[in-house]
Amino acid sequence: MMDNINFEFSNASQGSRLQLQQQPPQPFNLQDLNMIQYNQPSSPWTTETFSGLTPYDCTANQSFPVQCSSSKPYPSSFHPYHHQSSDSPSLDQSVSMIPMQPLPDQYMKPLYQRSCSNDFAATNASSASYSLSFEASHDPQELCRRTYSNSNVTHLNFTSSQHQPKQSHPRFSSPPSFSIHGGSMAPNCVNKTRIRWTQDLHEKFVECVNRLGGADKATPKAILKRMDSDGLTIFHVKSHLQKYRIAKYMPESQEGKFEKRACAKELSQLDTRTGVQIKEALQLQLDVQRHLHEQLEIQRNLQLRIEEQGKQLKMMMEQQQKNKESLLKKLPDAEASLSLLDPHIHSPPSPFLVHDAEALMLTSYEDTQLQSTKS
């Protein structure tokens, strides 16, 4: 790494020498920097330039934006490096006499490594193409590589010095391929390898899915952990799980739809028949309940009549008992009257009197029974 740049190019055949001399620091506005135009003879690297290779690279560690323009010449007062070949007499003498001066250290710290063994000004051609790339060490987004060709088309390529190794020679180096988005380097896509889902592997997958609660609850990460197969990644499991869900919840075929419709018709007819039968059974049940209610009413009336008859029988028995007691009371009185009439006759009580009393009681009972039936 060098703080000051001294470009020295020697040509033994023509004896011309071009040397960069360091000048005192001058104010330099890099934002107004335009395209540096070189009108030099062709170099040995012209073929390489047209082939897509850069003849040499110059790098400068500075964090500043560079504005490039291919239509306006670079003013001589702001040339960081300006030189004129001795073989080109068409340029202005005042411009050609201005020596090439490098930028001060505080503005630019160029990194340049080149093994210079060829002459820079010894070749004869009408145009030359050079490549100049500035690399920002502090801000990786402000790196610009500019390539100048005969068509004066400017090509910009933004690179980051933090991720690029230093190149010793541009001829054996390739242009940077990093692209910066928001200060970070975009990672390369991982190549996905395809695998063949065999029957055993699929059965193992289905078993893991069922253990995890079905296709809806299973996750690719859990399935991959349970399967534990070599060469199987989460991308394979995720894709296969999606296909498995689609196949599981695929709509039924037309055959299945027709069968389903036929079953639905049969079920509707069966439901109609069953409804009619249930209705008839309910009607019969209502009729039976009505008959039972009528029978219960009849039994209730009979029970009431039986209770009334029992009360009447009880009253009749009580009346008969009273009549019997009254007759028994009358018998001693009759015997006493007979003894008063004939005291010498002591005859036992006649058994016919008791029989007569019973017959009397029966007749009285029959009379009361007839009266109750009539009423």
Swiss-Prot record:
Start-end of DNA-binding region: 220-245
Keywords per UniProt: Coiled coil, DNA-binding, Nucleus, Transcription, Transcription regulation
Keyword Membrane: no
Coiled-coil ranges from the UniProt annotation: 279-299
Pfam family membership, one: Myb_CC_LHEQLE
Motif (LHEQLE): 292-297
Cellular compartments annotated: Nucleus
One example of a Gene Ontology biological process annotation: regulation of DNA-templated transcription
Signal sequence bounds: none
GO molecular function: DNA binding; DNA-binding transcription factor activity
Major location (coarse): nucleus
One GO CC term on file: nucleus
Domain of life: Eukaryota
Disordered: annotated segments: 159-178
Domain HTH myb-type: 189-249
Biased composition (Polar residues): 159-171
NCBIfam families in the cross-refs: myb_SHAQKYF
Family classification: Belongs to the MYB-CC family.
Protein name: Myb family transcription factor PHL5
Taxonomic lineage: Eukaryota, Viridiplantae, Streptophyta, Embryophyta, Tracheophyta
Name of the encoding gene: PHL5
